[in-house]
């Protein structure tokens, strides 16, 4: 309690200008503020409210003086920003920077245009986008059905499959058998006289016999 009256004359003198303040003086005011706080706590415990109010007024003046010194000092954050410190605005992504540059869209447009100018002969058309004749995209079953229909109509593609080759051989075999069966019939037909030849030969025989009979009659009349 004896130290508190000694602290009051230390803070009563006027404060020096804030422009000429040194770090040692600032540290001195900080130490005095610490002592004032300790004195205020002791007086509160003892119930001396008047002394507490006096020390609180001195503490408030010291704090305001230190705040004025801080405001008078040059702002160091400007130097830290130039050295590469990131501010919240710098850390936030810029929406315009996330968008691709206009040259990107130009390159994409040129690539699409070049793809449309490629002649169709270089790359064969494929996919469901080609709306040509329906026979261009037939599945294997429909192709086999068309080939079978062509086979019935007499248009047999050579080398279609093994079944067509077997059918072709069977067709030749049946033709050969039919030719062999027709040979004996023709031969027997050639050996047998038909009805016209038989009738002609009969008529010739009858004519000859009639002539011979007429000759016999003439001879008897001459006698």
UniProtKB/Swiss-Prot annotation:
This is GRF1-interacting factor 3. Interacts with GRF1. One of its GO terms (biological process) is cell division. It comes from the Eukaryota. Residues 179-223 are annotated as: Disordered. It comes from Arabidopsis thaliana. GO terms for molecular function: transcription coactivator activity. Keywords: Activator, Transcription, Transcription regulation. Belongs to the SS18 family. The keyword Membrane does not apply. Predominantly expressed in shoot tips containing the shoot apical meristem (SAM) and flower buds. Also expressed in mature flowers. One of its GO terms (cellular component) is nucleus. Residues 214-223 have a biased composition (Basic and acidic residues). Transcription coactivator that plays a role in the regulation of cell expansion in leaf and cotyledons tissues. Component of a network formed by miR396, the GRFs and their interacting factors (GIFs) acting in the regulation of meristem function, at least partially through the control of cell proliferation. GIFs are involved in the positive regulation of cell proliferation of lateral organs in a functionally redundant manner.
